[in-house]
Amino acid sequence: MGSRSRILLIGATGYIGRHVAKASLDLGHPTFLLVRESTASSNSEKAQLLESFKASGANIVHGSIDDHASLVEAVKNVDVVISTVGSLQIESQVNIIKAIKEVGTVKRFFPSEFGNDVDNVHAVEPAKSVFEVKAKVRRAIEAEGIPYTYVSSNCFAGYFLRSLAQAGLTAPPRDKVVILGDGNARVVFVKEEDIGTFTIKAVDDPRTLNKTLYLRLPANTLSLNELVALWEKKIDKTLEKAYVPEEEVLKLIADTPFPANISIAISHSIFVKGDQTNFEIGPAGVEASQLYPDVKYTTVDEYLSNFV
Protein backbone atom coordinates (compact mmCIF):
# COMPACT_ATOMS: atom_id res chain seq x y z
CA MET A 1 0.00 0.00 0.00
CA GLY A 2 1.26 3.48 -0.87
CA SER A 3 0.85 6.63 1.14
CA ARG A 4 -2.13 6.79 3.47
CA SER A 5 -5.23 8.59 2.26
CA ARG A 6 -5.94 12.12 3.40
CA ILE A 7 -9.13 12.05 5.46
CA LEU A 8 -11.71 14.78 6.02
CA LEU A 9 -13.82 14.11 9.10
CA ILE A 10 -17.14 15.91 9.54
CA GLY A 11 -18.43 15.66 13.11
CA ALA A 12 -15.09 15.06 14.84
CA THR A 13 -16.18 16.43 18.21
CA GLY A 14 -19.24 14.19 18.47
CA TYR A 15 -19.75 11.01 20.46
CA ILE A 16 -18.29 8.60 17.89
CA GLY A 17 -16.47 11.17 15.74
CA ARG A 18 -13.82 11.83 18.38
CA HIS A 19 -12.84 8.15 18.36
CA VAL A 20 -12.66 8.05 14.56
CA ALA A 21 -10.51 11.22 14.58
CA LYS A 22 -8.13 9.76 17.15
CA ALA A 23 -7.81 6.51 15.19
CA SER A 24 -7.11 8.44 11.98
CA LEU A 25 -4.29 10.33 13.68
CA ASP A 26 -2.97 7.24 15.49
CA LEU A 27 -2.85 5.25 12.24
CA GLY A 28 -0.88 7.99 10.47
CA HIS A 29 -3.43 9.50 8.10
CA PRO A 30 -3.20 13.20 7.19
CA THR A 31 -6.35 14.24 9.05
CA PHE A 32 -8.56 17.26 8.36
CA LEU A 33 -11.41 18.16 10.71
CA LEU A 34 -14.28 20.32 9.42
CA VAL A 35 -15.55 22.42 12.33
CA ARG A 36 -17.62 25.54 12.77
CA GLU A 37 -15.49 28.57 13.65
CA SER A 38 -17.72 29.16 16.69
CA THR A 39 -16.88 25.67 18.02
CA ALA A 40 -13.15 26.09 17.52
CA SER A 41 -13.04 29.51 19.21
CA SER A 42 -15.22 28.66 22.21
CA ASN A 43 -14.04 27.56 25.66
CA SER A 44 -16.08 24.39 25.46
CA GLU A 45 -15.02 20.80 25.96
CA LYS A 46 -15.23 20.44 22.17
CA ALA A 47 -12.75 23.29 21.65
CA GLN A 48 -10.34 21.64 24.10
CA LEU A 49 -10.74 18.36 22.24
CA LEU A 50 -9.90 20.12 18.96
CA GLU A 51 -6.76 21.57 20.56
CA SER A 52 -5.65 18.06 21.55
CA PHE A 53 -6.27 16.83 17.99
CA LYS A 54 -4.26 19.78 16.65
CA ALA A 55 -1.41 18.88 18.98
CA SER A 56 -1.52 15.36 17.50
CA GLY A 57 -1.23 16.73 13.97
CA ALA A 58 -4.81 17.32 12.83
CA ASN A 59 -5.59 20.16 10.44
CA ILE A 60 -8.59 22.25 11.51
CA VAL A 61 -10.72 23.45 8.59
CA HIS A 62 -13.42 26.04 9.31
CA GLY A 63 -16.74 25.38 7.66
CA SER A 64 -20.07 23.64 8.02
CA ILE A 65 -22.23 20.95 6.48
CA ASP A 66 -24.70 23.75 5.63
CA ASP A 67 -22.15 25.95 3.82
CA HIS A 68 -21.59 24.57 0.31
CA ALA A 69 -18.54 26.70 -0.51
CA SER A 70 -16.69 25.66 2.66
CA LEU A 71 -17.58 22.00 2.07
CA VAL A 72 -16.26 22.07 -1.49
CA GLU A 73 -13.05 23.77 -0.35
CA ALA A 74 -12.51 21.14 2.37
CA VAL A 75 -13.33 18.18 0.11
CA LYS A 76 -10.85 19.39 -2.57
CA ASN A 77 -7.91 18.66 -0.28
CA VAL A 78 -8.66 15.04 0.66
CA ASP A 79 -9.08 11.52 -0.70
CA VAL A 80 -11.67 10.20 1.76
CA VAL A 81 -14.59 11.86 3.54
CA ILE A 82 -15.98 10.40 6.77
CA SER A 83 -19.18 11.80 8.27
CA THR A 84 -20.03 11.14 11.91
CA VAL A 85 -22.75 13.76 12.21
CA GLY A 86 -25.51 13.26 14.77
CA SER A 87 -29.09 12.17 14.14
CA LEU A 88 -30.40 15.70 13.52
CA GLN A 89 -27.98 16.18 10.60
CA ILE A 90 -28.30 12.79 8.88
CA GLU A 91 -30.52 14.20 6.12
CA SER A 92 -28.17 17.18 5.62
CA GLN A 93 -25.52 14.75 4.37
CA VAL A 94 -27.00 15.29 0.90
CA ASN A 95 -24.94 18.51 1.07
CA ILE A 96 -21.77 16.43 1.49
CA ILE A 97 -22.82 14.24 -1.44
CA LYS A 98 -23.26 17.36 -3.62
CA ALA A 99 -19.82 18.68 -2.67
CA ILE A 100 -18.14 15.30 -3.30
CA LYS A 101 -19.87 15.04 -6.68
CA GLU A 102 -18.81 18.58 -7.63
CA VAL A 103 -15.16 18.05 -6.67
CA GLY A 104 -15.03 14.64 -8.35
CA THR A 105 -11.77 13.35 -6.84
CA VAL A 106 -12.93 11.69 -3.60
CA LYS A 107 -12.03 7.99 -3.52
CA ARG A 108 -14.44 7.01 -0.75
CA PHE A 109 -17.30 8.39 1.36
CA PHE A 110 -18.28 6.95 4.74
CA PRO A 111 -21.70 8.41 5.66
CA SER A 112 -22.77 8.61 9.30
CA GLU A 113 -24.00 5.10 10.12
CA PHE A 114 -22.38 3.39 13.13
CA GLY A 115 -25.39 1.38 14.29
CA ASN A 116 -27.74 -1.25 12.89
CA ASP A 117 -27.57 -2.03 9.18
CA VAL A 118 -30.45 0.14 8.01
CA ASP A 119 -31.09 -2.10 5.00
CA ASN A 120 -31.72 -5.06 7.34
CA VAL A 121 -34.05 -3.81 10.07
CA HIS A 122 -37.56 -4.66 11.23
CA ALA A 123 -38.17 -1.49 13.22
CA VAL A 124 -41.43 0.11 14.27
CA GLU A 125 -42.05 3.86 14.39
CA PRO A 126 -40.47 6.18 15.33
CA ALA A 127 -37.21 4.20 14.87
CA LYS A 128 -38.40 3.08 11.42
CA SER A 129 -38.25 6.68 10.15
CA VAL A 130 -34.82 7.24 11.76
CA PHE A 131 -33.42 4.23 9.90
CA GLU A 132 -35.20 5.23 6.67
CA VAL A 133 -33.41 8.59 6.63
CA LYS A 134 -30.04 6.80 6.76
CA ALA A 135 -31.19 4.42 4.01
CA LYS A 136 -32.23 7.42 1.90
CA VAL A 137 -28.68 8.83 2.22
CA ARG A 138 -27.29 5.47 1.08
CA ARG A 139 -29.50 5.49 -2.01
CA ALA A 140 -28.42 9.06 -2.83
CA ILE A 141 -24.73 8.07 -2.62
CA GLU A 142 -25.32 5.07 -4.88
CA ALA A 143 -27.40 7.10 -7.37
CA GLU A 144 -24.50 9.56 -7.77
CA GLY A 145 -21.98 6.75 -8.26
CA ILE A 146 -19.87 7.88 -5.29
CA PRO A 147 -17.57 5.13 -3.93
CA TYR A 148 -18.61 4.29 -0.35
CA THR A 149 -18.24 2.16 2.75
CA TYR A 150 -21.08 1.82 5.26
CA VAL A 151 -19.95 0.97 8.79
CA SER A 152 -22.48 -1.08 10.73
CA SER A 153 -20.92 -1.05 14.20
CA ASN A 154 -24.03 -2.15 16.12
CA CYS A 155 -24.23 -1.26 19.86
CA PHE A 156 -21.96 1.36 21.41
CA ALA A 157 -20.49 -0.24 24.53
CA GLY A 158 -20.70 3.09 26.37
CA TYR A 159 -24.47 3.22 25.89
CA PHE A 160 -25.60 -0.38 25.98
CA LEU A 161 -22.89 -2.57 27.52
CA ARG A 162 -21.89 -0.57 30.58
CA SER A 163 -25.56 -0.48 31.66
CA LEU A 164 -26.52 -3.99 30.46
CA ALA A 165 -29.02 -2.09 28.28
CA GLN A 166 -30.78 -0.60 31.32
CA ALA A 167 -32.21 2.87 30.68
CA GLY A 168 -30.64 5.59 32.80
CA LEU A 169 -27.80 3.50 34.27
CA THR A 170 -24.09 4.28 33.84
CA ALA A 171 -22.85 1.02 35.38
CA PRO A 172 -24.16 -2.55 35.30
CA PRO A 173 -27.03 -3.21 37.75
CA ARG A 174 -26.40 -5.25 40.89
CA ASP A 175 -29.97 -6.05 41.94
CA LYS A 176 -32.50 -6.15 39.12
CA VAL A 177 -32.37 -6.23 35.33
CA VAL A 178 -35.16 -5.55 32.82
CA ILE A 179 -34.96 -7.67 29.65
CA LEU A 180 -36.96 -6.77 26.54
CA GLY A 181 -38.42 -9.82 24.82
CA ASP A 182 -37.17 -13.29 25.77
CA GLY A 183 -33.53 -12.21 26.06
CA ASN A 184 -32.35 -14.66 23.39
CA ALA A 185 -31.76 -12.26 20.47
CA ARG A 186 -28.04 -12.02 19.76
CA VAL A 187 -26.60 -8.53 19.99
CA VAL A 188 -23.17 -7.04 19.19
CA PHE A 189 -21.46 -4.67 21.64
CA VAL A 190 -18.39 -2.71 20.48
CA LYS A 191 -16.17 -0.31 22.40
CA GLU A 192 -16.13 3.13 20.79
CA GLU A 193 -12.33 3.21 20.38
CA ASP A 194 -12.51 -0.06 18.45
CA ILE A 195 -15.21 1.35 16.16
CA GLY A 196 -12.77 4.17 15.35
CA THR A 197 -9.93 1.75 14.64
CA PHE A 198 -11.93 -0.60 12.39
CA THR A 199 -13.38 2.37 10.48
CA ILE A 200 -9.96 3.83 9.68
CA LYS A 201 -8.54 0.39 8.83
CA ALA A 202 -11.19 0.17 6.09
CA VAL A 203 -10.29 3.51 4.47
CA ASP A 204 -7.58 2.26 2.09
CA ASP A 205 -8.76 -1.35 1.88
CA PRO A 206 -10.09 -2.38 -1.56
CA ARG A 207 -12.06 -5.19 0.13
CA THR A 208 -14.36 -2.64 1.79
CA LEU A 209 -15.01 -0.56 -1.34
CA ASN A 210 -18.76 -0.26 -2.05
CA LYS A 211 -19.47 -2.66 0.83
CA THR A 212 -21.03 -2.61 4.26
CA LEU A 213 -18.40 -3.23 6.94
CA TYR A 214 -20.06 -5.17 9.75
CA LEU A 215 -18.50 -5.16 13.21
CA ARG A 216 -19.93 -8.54 14.18
CA LEU A 217 -17.12 -9.43 16.56
CA PRO A 218 -17.36 -13.07 17.73
CA ALA A 219 -16.32 -12.44 21.36
CA ASN A 220 -18.79 -9.55 21.59
CA THR A 221 -21.86 -11.18 20.04
CA LEU A 222 -24.16 -12.55 22.71
CA SER A 223 -27.74 -12.49 23.92
CA LEU A 224 -28.92 -10.38 26.84
CA ASN A 225 -29.46 -13.60 28.81
CA GLU A 226 -25.83 -14.58 28.17
CA LEU A 227 -24.65 -11.07 29.02
CA VAL A 228 -26.53 -11.03 32.34
CA ALA A 229 -25.20 -14.52 33.19
CA LEU A 230 -21.64 -13.32 32.50
CA TRP A 231 -22.14 -10.31 34.79
CA GLU A 232 -23.72 -12.45 37.52
CA LYS A 233 -20.69 -14.73 37.44
CA LYS A 234 -18.34 -11.74 37.76
CA ILE A 235 -20.12 -10.30 40.82
CA ASP A 236 -21.08 -13.73 42.23
CA LYS A 237 -24.72 -12.74 42.56
CA THR A 238 -27.99 -13.64 40.84
CA LEU A 239 -29.99 -10.65 39.62
CA GLU A 240 -33.77 -10.43 39.70
CA LYS A 241 -34.95 -10.56 36.08
CA ALA A 242 -38.06 -8.86 34.70
CA TYR A 243 -38.92 -9.93 31.16
CA VAL A 244 -41.06 -7.57 29.07
CA PRO A 245 -43.00 -9.37 26.30
CA GLU A 246 -43.02 -7.80 22.84
CA GLU A 247 -46.68 -6.69 23.11
CA GLU A 248 -45.80 -4.70 26.24
CA VAL A 249 -42.74 -3.18 24.57
CA LEU A 250 -44.90 -2.05 21.63
CA LYS A 251 -47.47 -0.58 24.03
CA LEU A 252 -44.69 1.28 25.87
CA ILE A 253 -43.46 2.74 22.56
CA ALA A 254 -47.01 3.84 21.68
CA ASP A 255 -47.65 5.37 25.13
CA THR A 256 -44.30 7.19 25.46
CA PRO A 257 -44.17 10.72 23.98
CA PHE A 258 -41.83 11.54 21.09
CA PRO A 259 -38.80 11.77 21.08
CA ALA A 260 -38.34 9.61 24.21
CA ASN A 261 -39.95 6.69 22.40
CA ILE A 262 -37.21 6.61 19.73
CA SER A 263 -34.71 4.88 22.02
CA ILE A 264 -37.31 2.32 23.11
CA ALA A 265 -38.17 1.58 19.47
CA ILE A 266 -34.47 1.18 18.62
CA SER A 267 -34.09 -1.19 21.59
CA HIS A 268 -37.09 -3.17 20.28
CA SER A 269 -35.29 -3.58 16.93
CA ILE A 270 -32.06 -4.69 18.63
CA PHE A 271 -33.16 -6.76 21.62
CA VAL A 272 -36.56 -8.11 20.55
CA LYS A 273 -36.24 -8.46 16.78
CA GLY A 274 -32.51 -9.26 16.87
CA ASP A 275 -31.85 -6.97 13.91
CA GLN A 276 -28.08 -6.95 14.41
CA THR A 277 -27.64 -10.68 13.82
CA ASN A 278 -30.85 -12.10 12.32
CA PHE A 279 -29.43 -12.13 8.78
CA GLU A 280 -26.39 -13.59 7.06
CA ILE A 281 -23.72 -11.20 5.82
CA GLY A 282 -24.10 -11.41 2.04
CA PRO A 283 -21.73 -10.56 -0.83
CA ALA A 284 -22.40 -6.83 -0.32
CA GLY A 285 -20.89 -7.04 3.17
CA VAL A 286 -17.63 -7.92 4.92
CA GLU A 287 -16.90 -8.60 8.60
CA ALA A 288 -14.30 -6.48 10.39
CA SER A 289 -12.63 -9.05 12.66
CA GLN A 290 -12.13 -11.37 9.68
CA LEU A 291 -10.55 -8.61 7.59
CA TYR A 292 -8.40 -7.27 10.44
CA PRO A 293 -7.45 -10.14 12.77
CA ASP A 294 -4.52 -7.99 13.96
CA VAL A 295 -6.89 -5.57 15.74
CA LYS A 296 -7.06 -6.59 19.38
CA TYR A 297 -10.51 -5.33 20.24
CA THR A 298 -11.83 -5.06 23.79
CA THR A 299 -14.05 -8.06 24.50
CA VAL A 300 -17.34 -7.88 26.42
CA ASP A 301 -15.71 -9.96 29.16
CA GLU A 302 -12.79 -7.51 29.50
CA TYR A 303 -15.10 -4.49 29.37
CA LEU A 304 -17.35 -5.72 32.17
CA SER A 305 -14.36 -6.56 34.38
CA ASN A 306 -13.79 -2.80 34.76
CA PHE A 307 -17.06 -2.53 36.71
CA VAL A 308 -16.68 -5.42 39.16
UniProtKB/Swiss-Prot annotation:
Domain of life (superkingdom): Eukaryota
EC number(s) per entry: 1.23.1.-
One of the record's GO molecular function terms: oxidoreductase activity, acting on NAD(P)H, oxygen as acceptor
Keyword Oxidoreductase: yes
Active site: 134
InterPro entries, alphabetized: NAD(P)-bd_dom_sf, NmrA-like, NmrA-type/Isoflavone_red_sf, PCBER-like
Coiled coil: none
Catalytic activity: (-)-dehydrodiconiferyl alcohol + NADPH + H(+) = (S)-isodihydrodehydrodiconiferyl alcohol + NADP(+); (+)-dehydrodiconiferyl alcohol + NADPH + H(+) = (R)-isodihydrodehydrodiconiferyl alcohol + NADP(+); (2R,3S)-dihydrodehydrodiconiferyl alcohol + NADPH + H(+) = (S)-tetrahydrodehydrodiconiferyl alcohol + NADP(+); (2S,3R)-dihydrodehydrodiconiferyl alcohol + NADPH + H(+) = (R)-tetrahydrodehydrodiconiferyl alcohol + NADP(+)
Ligand binding (NADP(+)): 11-17, 36, 46, 138
UniProt xrefs under Pfam families: NmrA
EC class: oxidoreductase
Keyword NADP on entry: yes
GO BP, sorted A to Z: lignan biosynthetic process
Functional summary from the UniProt entry: Oxidoreductase involved in lignan biosynthesis. Catalyzes the NADPH-dependent reduction of phenylcoumaran benzylic ethers. Converts dehydrodiconiferyl alcohol (DDC) to isodihydrodehydrodiconiferyl alcohol (IDDDC), and dihydrodehydrodiconiferyl alcohol (DDDC) to tetrahydrodehydrodiconiferyl alcohol (TDDC).
Family in the record: Belongs to the NmrA-type oxidoreductase family. Isoflavone reductase subfamily.
PANTHER family in alphabetical order: ISOFLAVONE REDUCTASE HOMOLOG P3-RELATED, PINORESINOL REDUCTASE-RELATED
Record-given protein name: Phenylcoumaran benzylic ether reductase PT1
Organism: Pinus taeda
Gene transcribed to yield this protein: PCBER
